[in-house]
Amino acid sequence: MQPDPRPSGAGACCRFLPLQSQCPEGAGDAVMYASTECKAEVTPSQHGNRTFSYTLEDHTKQAFGIMNELRLSQQLCDVTLQVKYQDAPAAQFMAHKVVLASSSPVFKAMFTNGLREQGMEVVSIEGIHPKVMERLIEFAYTASISMGEKCVLHVMNGAVMYQIDSVVRACSDFLVQQLDPSNAIGIANFAEQIGCVELHQRAREYIYMHFGEVAKQEEFFNLSHCQLVTLISRDDLNVRCESEVFHACINWVKYDCEQRRFYVQALLRAVRCHSLTPNFLQMQLQKCEILQSDSRCKDYLVKIFEELTLHKPTQVMPCRAPKVGRLIYTAGGYFRQSLSYLEAYNPSDGTWLRLADLQVPRSGLAGCVVGGLLYAVGGRNNSPDGNTDSSALDCYNPMTNQWSPCAPMSVPRNRIGVGVIDGHIYAVGGSHGCIHHNSVERYEPERDEWHLVAPMLTRRIGVGVAVLNRLLYAVGGFDGTNRLNSAECYYPERNEWRMITAMNTIRSGAGVCVLHNCIYAAGGYDGQDQLNSVERYDVETETWTFVAPMKHRRSALGITVHQGRIYVLGGYDGHTFLDSVECYDPDTDTWSEVTRMTSGRSGVGVAVTMEPCRKQIDQQNCTC
């Protein structure tokens, strides 16, 4: 056949040359067939540079399926694993080295790195249960594994031994989903033993977050004293009050008092005892049998009791800061009329949440937190129908996104200040119509009762209130005639007020808070202008000093502290109801605008507590 002389291009044909056998004479048909050479020639298209590719998507699955069939029928297998585990009967599993090596770096090293197993047809395996090995071999061929819940720990341990990371991750994810108070410590210990960092971290985080429930379980009582000290020393332990930690330690000791009574002192030093109330300490010193039998521990707590009741500044461990979202809550406020809004700002991502409204609109109220619950205290309902001063106390639960009414105060209090000592709310000053109060009353949440305490030395509305070293400070305000720069301090043990150094500036409606053992007073109204100046009171030197001013003048502002920084929200600048939010960094002595409220307002109640349950709310992402 002669070659076709036509040029390449559309309609180009192929040239076929005759096949010529390269077989030696007499080699046989089979050999001749295998060695036949194709010499077909193809004339390319006019494009000339095209490529052809083809992928069979299911090839790997099909190939491994066939190899698994070969394994099950014991064909072409080149290794037998002889698995022996403790007293369990030995088992043999035939397999293909290449498949095992493809799924496990341990098997790959065993069969390719010149180890003695590389040339062995029977390999002895110890330290893993035959049923676990059977499942891991099945996974190598099928990429699928299933087991009962009780077997997960054993399979995960085997997967760790043979470095089958995908199985380790799957088991870890399953165990994370199974975490509950009764098994979290056991899972954490298991993860630590096998070196699974992620599972260990997730289990520990669960323990920290649910400490109160975990501390009631059998696993908790089986902790060693070193493990318990490490646990209760965590700053991120999530407890409503430090007495939970104290009781957990005492109960742990009682579980085996004869052996554990020697560890009481070490445990108490890990408890944040300065966060316990004097009343609680006094009761434990009187009634706790374990403390009665240990004079050193008793003396240690007596010393702390004295420091608390003498209001001494102490170098103590920091307050616990659980890794649960803590948001800045703003309740009520005023813009043309009193508002019922409850909103929460998340400084970590800049978002606002709209939550359950106050049952009655209020401005000039105060906010505080006790045991994770947000309280809205006093204020006034300014509405087109009239103005009504409020004696109300309402409690908001972030877990249910609901308000509940509590016992009202003895008198209505608008432009009130509040502070919390030993879990009790102190309502300070305020006004009822033209009456300017110097009276103060204390609310006990356990009893839902208010009781009057000693009145202030000065009548004050628009008063700033803060608590430091268990002392209640009332700063500035208006007495009905004059705006004030004076300040006074309440001693709960003596039930008396004492004047302290006056501020440098007259301030009514200032924002007052505590940061790093100092009292800050920001903004306010001096009788002529709204202020942007800020001053700080050092309780050691008993002096007020100015710090950097805010970027905006504001009175009737909201103020709080979040993660070591001061936040001021809203207020009135003399012309406008502000929506701006500023943040003060004490390390750099600077203010910065961080966000805007959803609308301008003054006279809000502000406090910080846990993030609300997302199932109960609809999140509103507010952009500034």
From Swiss-Prot:
It comes from the Eukaryota. The modification S-nitrosocysteine is found at residue 151. Residues 184-286 form the BACK domain. Changing residue 310 to A: Loss of export from nucleus. The modification S-(2,3-dicarboxypropyl)cysteine is found at residues 151, 257, 273, 288. The keyword Repeat applies. Changing residue 380 to A: Loss of interaction with NFE2L2/NRF2. Abolishes repression of NFE2L2/NRF2-dependent gene expression. Impaired interaction with SQSTM1/p62. Changing residue 382 to A: Loss of interaction with NFE2L2/NRF2. Strongly reduces repression of NFE2L2/NRF2-dependent gene expression. Impaired interaction with SQSTM1/p62. The modification S-(2-succinyl)cysteine is found at residues 38, 151, 241, 288, 319, 613. Signal peptide: none annotated. SMART domains: BACK, BTB, Kelch. GO terms for biological process: cellular response to interleukin-4; cellular response to oxidative stress; in utero embryonic development; negative regulation of response to oxidative stress; negative regulation of transcription by RNA polymerase II; positive regulation of proteasomal ubiquitin-dependent protein catabolic process; proteasome-mediated ubiquitin-dependent protein catabolic process; protein ubiquitination. Changing residue 483 to A: Loss of interaction with NFE2L2/NRF2. Abolishes repression of NFE2L2/NRF2-dependent gene expression. Loss of interaction with PGAM5. Does not affect interaction with SQSTM1/p62. Pathway: Protein modification; protein ubiquitination. There is a cross-link at residue 135 (N5-[4-(S-L-cysteinyl)-5-methyl-1H-imidazol-2-yl]-L-ornithine (Arg-Cys) (interchain with C-151 in KEAP1)). InterPro entries: BACK (IPR011705), BTB-kelch_protein (IPR017096), BTB/POZ_dom (IPR000210), KEAP1_BACK (IPR047098), KEAP1_BTB_POZ_dom (IPR030563), Kelch-typ_b-propeller (IPR015915), Kelch_1 (IPR006652), SKP1/BTB/POZ_sf (IPR011333). Changing residue 430 to C: In a lung adenocarcinoma patient; somatic mutation; strongly reduces interaction with NFE2L2/NRF2 and reduces repression of NFE2L2/NRF2-dependent gene expression. Ubiquitin ligase activity of the BCR(KEAP1) complex is inhibited by oxidative stress and electrophile metabolites such as sulforaphane. Electrophile metabolites react with reactive cysteine residues in KEAP1 and trigger non-enzymatic covalent modifications of these cysteine residues, leading to inactivate the ubiquitin ligase activity of the BCR(KEAP1) complex. Selective autophagy also inactivates the BCR(KEAP1) complex via interaction between KEAP1 and SQSTM1/p62, which sequesters the complex in inclusion bodies and promotes its degradation. Belongs to the KEAP1 family. KEAP1 contains reactive cysteine residues that act as sensors for endogenously produced and exogenously encountered small molecules, which react with sulfhydryl groups and modify the cysteine sensors, leading to impair ability of the BCR(KEAP1) complex to ubiquitinate target proteins. The Kelch repeats mediate interaction with NFE2L2/NRF2, BPTF and PGAM5. This is Kelch-like ECH-associated protein 1. It comes from Homo sapiens (Human). The lineage of its organism: Eukaryota, Metazoa, Chordata, Craniata, Vertebrata.
